[in-house]
Amino acid sequence: MKNKSIFYIFICLLFILLSINFNIAAEEISLNGAVKLLNKSSSQLDNVLRDIESAEIDLKLAEKGLAAEVTLQTSYTRLDEAPQSPTEYVLSPTGKINFQGSEVNKYRFIPVTFKKLSQDNYRASLSINKPLYLGGQVKNAVKLSEKAVQLSKLNYEKTLNERINSIIQAYFNVLIKDSLLSVQKNSLKLVQEHLDNVIKNYEAGMAIKSDVNEVEIELNKSKQSLYQSENELKIAKKRLADLLNLPDLDFSLIEPKLPELKEELNFHLQRAYNNSFELQSLLLKQKMNDINKEMENKLFKPSFFLNGNYTVQGDKLDLDQGDFNITLSGSVTLYDGNKSKLNLKKINLEEASLKNNQKQLRSNIETEIMAALYKIDENKKKLKIAEKNKIHALENYNQAVKSFNNGVANSLDVLRAETNLNQIKISQSQTYYQYMMSVYNLLYQTGTLNNYFEEVIKSENK
């Protein structure tokens, strides 16, 4: 009895473990979930975030451009022999000289007794250097650093938009390959059923051997297509798993919702202009050029510094017996070898290039938005046609099977109808997902993918 109880417990535990494994294998990932995983696992996004942090540190450094600098220097010297200082002198005549019309004697002091001084010598110096005014260069350096922070944050948004688009492409590629596999499985099932019917007719003398061979050939072709579809699905899942840093391929995808869409060109153009990372980047660079111009124009303005120094020196380190001095200094650049003018010329050339790039970029954006809208319209029309074709192909297939069963049609008619139905199902499935992809591509081209997944990204960053 005890052994039976242990056996039942073992069976229950095994069932639980298998259930857990099944649940893990059957894990479903939504498009929102994929974006969450991307935000968590993307090393490229991590690198861009580090760039933002680095730019913010540069901004803090620029803000400290007028900060005081305090320097402390100390030294100690031990002499090999103690120095001597004279304490008594004698006067010794050295001759006569004419002084103011009279002849007078000259003398010199000759030391005769000495005292030893300390062999120790201490020295300490405290210096404070404070820039008071640097010709407005610090203020402009802060402005440049602020623009650099904005540029790095803009680069993060651009990178995030591109990475989300990569995820969407890989995500829908898996859905397409999965749907193709389902079509191939269903096709194989239909061919197998037809083969069974042909074999029965052959055994009953109602079909010839070549009919059986034709269907078996078609069955083998269906198996080959099935193996190819299975392999393509594995590759597509592996690419998505690599993007999301998933450990294995034991997952399935949930079909995402279709974003709401306005098919107005001007509406999407305005969104693209407002959200274009490249356009915003060019505008920031133009502002940075303006700041650089201002810095070059202020190069010949004076700079002022305040310097304070307190020094103590002696055989004892007595901080109360030091010397203090304070200095106010100024400097101005009178001539820089014409470098400033050359730099201004270079900045003006860069500004002209930025304006040309901006004009070309706006033209490119318009082309991409028009192409995206045309693709949506094309896929929508193709999808309607594909759905009608599927209905007709299914009717033809059912009619061919019915005619074959009634002895009116031959086996090849059924195979042709089945092949046509299979191709139309594949086309309809691909067109359906391509239509969804084209809608998401419009979000990508308008730079609004980040906004569409904003809540998902925010929830992950909390």
What feature does the model see in each segment?
Residues 1-8, 29-33, 57, 158-271, ...:
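Periplasmic alpha-helical coiled-coil/stalk elements that build and connect Gram-negative outer-membrane
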Residues 10-20:
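Bacterial N-terminal signal peptides
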Residues 20-26:
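Sec/Tat signal peptide C-region and signal peptidase I cleavage site
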Residues 47-62, 159, 163-182, 193, ...:
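Amphipathic alpha-helical coiled-coil segments
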